Amino acid sequence: MATDLTQEFCALRDTYIEKQFGRLNDMQRQAVFTTDGPLLILAGAGSGKTTVLVNRIANIIRFGSAHGSKQTPRPATEDDIKALRNAIMTGTAAPSWLDGMLRQNAVRSWNVMAITFTNKAAGELKERLRRMLGGEEGDEVFASTFHSACVRILRRWAEEIGYPRSFTIYDTDDSQRVMKAVYKDLNVDDKFLPIKAAINQMSRWKDQLVSPEQALASPAKDTKGALTARIYAAYEKRLKEAGAFDFDDLIYQTVQLLAEHKDVRDFYQNKYRYLLVDEYQDTSVAQFRLVSLLTGPEKNICVVGDDDQSIYRFRGATIENILNFERIYPGTKTIRLEQNYRSTSNILNAANCVIQHNTERKGKTLWTSNGEGDKVQVYTAENEQDEASHIADVIGQHLKEGGHLADHAILYRMNAQSAPIESYFTRAGIPHKIVGGQRFNDRKEVKDIHSYMSIVANPRDDVRLRRIINEPARKIGATTVEVIADLAAQEGVSMLDIIGHADQYAKLSRAVMPLLKFWQIYQRLQDSLETRTLDEFAADVIELTGYKAMLEADAAKGHEDAADRLQNLGQLVNNVKNYCDQHGEEATLEGYLEDIALISDIDSYNESADQVVLMTIHSAKGLEFPYVFLIGMEEGVFPSEMSKYSEADLEEERRLAYVGITRAKKELYISNSVSRMLYGRTQRNEPSRFLQEIEPEYIEETRSSVLEQRSRFGGWGDSYRDTVPGGASGYSGPSGWGRSASGYGTGGYGSSYSNRGGYLNREYNAGEGRGFGSAYANRGQSQSGYGSGYGRSGAGTEYGSGYSSAYSDGTTQKKSAKQISFTGTPAAKTAAKGAKHYEPGDLVEHKVFGRGQVVAVKPAAGDQIVEINFEKVGIKKTMANFAPLTKITAEE
């Protein structure tokens, strides 16, 4: 009887536990309730992997391996069954006296470690765990990035490997400063071996867990290889003397610590009985080794990843880590999450079409119950400016339908592709944000104040000291700094130690006073840290160092950026206060400096700001947007030119395309261009093979109206246009201002050029000939124009009745090809004649922002800066002649 009751209780227990984790699909449920042993979760894009991670962690903590088990700590009773059945029927929590019967091998929150790749992902995981487990219990789960986890380990054990626990974390700029010193010591010519090349090689060595000693002992391929090994050893020596790690060291040194110190390794394996790793497909050799060292003898390791989204090989990621996981961890259970909750089926089918051409993959097919949705829109543009204009048109239409700017993301293969979009959007007054631009913490004034804070936290940090010892100017020159460095090296102390005793060194006699004044500032900052709150300390740093006074003096002299720099320092203090509010009593200077050192580009992305987002596809990993524009889908651009020569590189490019496609929720727009200017030269590329891999039934193709016109008249050629005053690049748009259409004659079809900017105002009109003609319309700004017509390959004297047309804000201008005229009209007058003019009170319509009223007008360089109060988006400023504005009446 007792056995029957226990079996009944176990069945009810399964039902009760399942109800605690509702709204999971079958495969997600399997992943959540598989708790013991190695587990590989192949999670497709948008398949709810974060939901699985959160629920799996909660299950491990609340119930352990109870689900599916037939065991109980004691025989079940009728009262147990009655109480549990009542909890199931009423949807309430089971009574606390049943807790022991509902748990099996459950662990405490602090026994679980979850590792993610970005602070954003870690933050989301923590927040959802707080909501599911409660604030205190959720906070005790250790969820962090790889680098943050390593910093935490090193803060406790750094002395075991010869570093102070108050170590500094160097960024790229700091590393380059160290390298310059190393190059000077070793008398290395940067032209022979660029610093960047040496840093990249050292990064690869660390990622492959190659120590300086191993690099020196390994046979070098050439002189540069041997020299780089010497530089590596000298660089690491300098970092150790400064008590600093660079970003690569954080993982490399943690691996060395765990591998060489069994007591440390045992401590973490015993503490973290369950290890979960997200984005496992992007782990490197060093990260793979770190995970294996943290995994305990029970092998309770769960990795989540998607081999189809492995896109960081250039950073050292190796897809083999996920492909070989089942071989490395025998007994692995593999679960595939293929139901997508993000996108429509047309978008997913397009993604599936592309990725199935890869051979190095586990294999899975995404599907959704979201419905077909719109087909993928593929647009062929004349050039990159036409591409930008088309995107603006689509965004404008979405806004008219009630959408928001932040719903839109423009993704590209390489950063250089963003310039035409940014330029177009700036002229059109479309709010946008480039993720991956200059970060707040990279601004000079911010880095300077952080450097002051760093030397207070770590007095051995000579690199940061060099940065600010004469900032603001204190009459401490470069020669004095080198003398200090030499003395510090001779005596085996820090540069700050020498500065504090400057009056004892004859070599420093000329600089004693400024050095001792600097030492006094340093001591006052130390006192401030000990007696004031952290945000007050930050304010003191800005004040006591003289930095604030310097910027205020610059502002008084009319320096344009001084006020902005002061505001940035005010924001820095706010950031410190926010850090204190988040961490409470645990807030420390070292902790704050860690946080800013580990911030990535995507962590600074503000999702609440209503602006169009521009970013590389690599940066967009893990994000989603209702509307995605995937631009530059051309051979040589995407896939990149170099990838064509390596099958592995080409497969990585295809995975990158798959990632880009699967960022879209509602609609996906892919564009390619007949002509594209990149890196100062115009390229003509074929459409990307990835476009051709998508089945026609999932896409809808459109082309630039100019391209359509060409094909309609059986011709070929090019059209360029530039609407930027004084600009040089080509520019065209299907419905924007400055649009150029074709010129043709009876002898064939010609190309049309329209440039606004440069020095000449020319109009050439193509005429009849046996071959094809060309039509040009250049609108310059400084010289008069002239025109002529000709047939290129026919008789030069025969002129036909073709025409050339140029559009400006919808106005068509036609000129007979028969007429050859020297107008003698100055370009400035021509421009003025077609210029727009607005007055306060004018009603206007913007193709993106909709209706608005002009509230202020300011003349500027032959144009007007127009301030408009739009009904939907409020006050915006734009240039009159280069914005998509149309005057309207109240009745319209």
Protein language model features and the residues they cover:
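Helicase P-loop NTPase motor core
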Residues: 47-53, 68, 73, 77, ...
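Conserved helicase motor core of SF1/SF2 NTP-dependent helicases
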Residues: 47, 281-360, 364-369, 486-489, ...
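Conserved helicase C-terminal RecA-like lobe
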Residues: 217-221, 404, 418-430, 443, ...
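P-loop NTPase Walker
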Residues: 1-164, 169, 266, 320, ...
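Short basic/glycine-enriched coil/helix segment immediately N-terminal to the Walker B
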Residues: 33, 37, 104-109, 256-275, ...
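Conserved helicase/translocase P-loop NTPase motor core
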Residues: 23, 80, 88-97, 146-150, ...
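C-terminal accessory regions
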Residues: 633-874, 882-892
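ATP-hydrolysis module of ASCE/P-loop NTPase motor domains
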Residues: 35, 117, 137-141, 158-249, ...
